[in-house]
Regions:
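Conserved P-loop NTPase nucleotide-binding/switch module
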Residues: 119-144
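Preference for solvent-exposed, low-hydrophobicity sequence contexts
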Residues: 1-13, 20, 143, 147-187
Length: 190
């Protein structure tokens, strides 16, 4: 098994909440969907939260979207686009309204759990650098209370965030490099 397959296996089999971190075009959404697919195959009840307010998988831009994954058909991009629940942020830049973003994450986390999800997969945006990226990820981890943080990084770009996660939360961190086949598409909305 390569490092990405190991990460998917660990998250799908053992985590209750996994947060995927990485810069732009790191493959977070692809790995999150692979984790959801495998978890579904082994009998887990999965909810997918898309916390990237610009490059959306679940729901429209400027929102946090949540989708229950009940079958493999729910993992197609067309099906994922239709959220089961939304939280409005109002900007494609998370730093513009951090309170709205964190509040939406908390409400959708609670709703997913109430509605029976035993695995919550959180796909985050690519803001990882500087104090703004570090604070954003700190507050996300704080409110989501994951038992696994999965990071896809180029070089050591996530190490400052991993240091914060380790120091303040003591949560398991799974590191992997960005897959060499990841295609950079950039951010068209920002």
């Amino acid at each position: 098994m390569n490092e990405h397959e190991q990460l998917v296996d660990r998250a799908a089999r053992h985590a209750h909440t996994v947060v995927f971190l990485g810069g732009l075009d790191a493959g977070k959404s692809t790995l999150a969907r692979a984790t959801a697919a495998f978890a579904l195959r082994i009998g887990r009840s999965v909810a997918y939260i898309d916390a990237d307010v610009a490059e959306k998988t679940v729901g429209p831009p400027t929102t946090v979207g949540m989708k229950h994954i009940r079958s493999a058909d729910d993992l197609t991009l067309d099906a994922l686009a239709h959220a089961d629940a939304l939280g409005f942020v109002g900007s494609t830049r998370p730093q513009d309204d951090l309170v709205a973003l964190i509040g939406a994450l908390q409400r959708l986390r609670d709703r997913a759990r109430t509605e029976g999800a035993d695995l919550l997969i959180v796909d985050t945006g690519g803001e990882v650098s500087g104090i703004a990226g570090e604070l954003l990820k700190y507050y996300m981890v704080d409110v989501l209370e994951p038992d696994l943080v999965a990071g896809l990084q180029r070089g050591q770009e996530l190490e400052p965030i991993f240091g914060i996660v380790d120091r303040f939360f003591g949560i398991e961190i799974a590191r992997a490099s960005v897959h060499p086949d990841v295609v950079k598409i950039g951010r068209a909305h920002v």
